[in-house]
Swiss-Prot record:
<dbReference type="GO" id="GO:0008200">
    <property type="term" value="F:ion channel inhibitor activity"/>
</dbReference>
<protein>
    <recommendedName>
        <fullName>Conotoxin LiCr173</fullName>
    </recommendedName>
</protein>
<comment type="similarity">
    <text>Belongs to the conotoxin O3 superfamily.</text>
</comment>
<dbReference type="InterPro" id="IPR004214">
    <property type="entry name" value="Conotoxin"/>
</dbReference>
<keyword id="KW-0027">Amidation</keyword>
<keyword id="KW-0732">Signal</keyword>
<feature type="disulfide bond">
    <location>
        <begin position="63"/>
        <end position="77"/>
    </location>
</feature>
<keyword id="KW-0528">Neurotoxin</keyword>
<feature type="modified residue" description="Phenylalanine amide">
    <location>
        <position position="78"/>
    </location>
</feature>
<feature type="disulfide bond">
    <location>
        <begin position="52"/>
        <end position="64"/>
    </location>
</feature>
<feature type="propeptide">
    <location>
        <begin position="21"/>
        <end position="46"/>
    </location>
</feature>
<feature type="signal peptide">
    <location>
        <begin position="1"/>
        <end position="20"/>
    </location>
</feature>
<keyword id="KW-0964">Secreted</keyword>
<dbReference type="GO" id="GO:0090729">
    <property type="term" value="F:toxin activity"/>
</dbReference>
<keyword id="KW-0960">Knottin</keyword>
<dbReference type="Pfam" id="PF02950">
    <property type="entry name" value="Conotoxin"/>
</dbReference>
<feature type="disulfide bond">
    <location>
        <begin position="56"/>
        <end position="73"/>
    </location>
</feature>
């Protein structure tokens, strides 16, 4: 009986360890996805000032921010 009890306890411990390890992987993946979404938002949501907007509107383009202090104008802004 004691051998059987030891085997049952060992199996329960193994099952607990495996399921907790799998849950940790899901949590880690969720956190990684959240970080990726935050990075994407920060890339696409750039702040532009009025001078850049006016400068680019004269050229029928969108202001994509500034590079070396100069406005960057393009039809579509990418990162």
């Amino acid at each position: 009986m004691s051998g059987l009890g030891t085997m049952v306890l060992t199996l329960l411990l193994l099952v607990f360890m495996v399921t907790s390890h799998q849950d940790g992987g899901k949590k880690q993946a969720t956190q990684r996805n959240a970080v990726n979404i935050r990075r994407r938002k920060s890339i696409t949501q750039r702040t532009t000032d009025e001078k850049c907007n006016e400068y680019c509107e004269e050229r029928d383009r969108n202001c994509c921010g500034k590079a070396n202090g100069e406005p960057r104008c393009a039809r579509m802004c990418f990162g």
